[in-house]
Design a protein with these regions (language model features):
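Hydrophobic packing within well-folded, soluble alpha/beta domains
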Residues: 44, 88, 92, 105, ...
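Conserved active-site alpha-helix within GNAT-family acetyltransferase domains
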Residues: 82, 86-87, 98, 111-129
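Acetyl-CoA-dependent GNAT
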Residues: 17-78, 89-90, 95, 151-154
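Conserved catalytic-core motifs of GNAT/GCN5-like acyltransferases
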Residues: 106-109, 121, 126-141
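A short, well-structured alpha-helix characteristic of acyl/acetyltransferase catalytic modules
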Residues: 1-17, 155-156
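Terminal substrate-recognition subdomain of acyl/acetyltransferases
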Residues: 141-156
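Conserved GNAT acetyl-CoA-binding A-motif
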Residues: 96-108
Length: 156
């Protein structure tokens, strides 16, 4: 599950299904992630192919958001709804609990992605708000972006 520089080229296989960046952008990103102590990244490989990615990082700017971990997760269609997403998120949440400064994990999810929303809710994430008509989908419809968060520690 741990990402390395060797995973960059296979990650291109996810591009047809996701909005991942170009190869050059991925190379810069992966190098930055590998060197950054406030990033947590997992790559899922199956039969020699990259089929999933979870990337998370602590917000550094503004400094008032330095307690927030934001993440992105992508799984190719054949491996969805098999527990892989749950495992990726569980590992990230476990890592986040060990990082004293992280108090909140946040994400944005399309309102049309009901399986992901259900998973996040099962893990304790709550809806914080919506950006109406944030995404224009290929079929011509629009989807909201739902902001969700998991609060790890509360100041008493």
């Amino acid at each position: 599950f741990d990402a390395s520089a060797q995973d960059d080229e296979p990650l291109q296989g996810l591009d047809s299904e996701t909005s991942l960046p170009t190869l050059a952008e991925k190379e810069r990103w992966l190098q930055e992630v590998m060197e950054h102590p406030d990033c947590f990244t997992l790559v899922v490989e199956q039969a020699g192919n990259i089929v999933g990615l979870l990337e998370s990082r602590v917000r550094e700017l503004p400094r008032s958001n330095a307690h927030v971990l934001r993440f992105y997760v992508s799984l190719s269609a054949p491996v969805r709804r098999r527990g892989i997403g749950s495992e990726l998120l569980a590992r990230m949440i476990e890592w986040a609990h060990a990082q004293e400064r992280i108090k909140k994990i946040s994400l944005g999810v399309l309102s049309t992605n009901t399986p992901a929303i259900s998973l996040y809710q099962r893990l304790g994430f709550v809806e914080e708000g919506r950006k109406k008509m944030e995404y224009h989908l290929p079929d011509g419809s629009f989807a909201d972006e739902i902001s969700m968060a998991l609060f790890l520690r509360r100041k008493l």
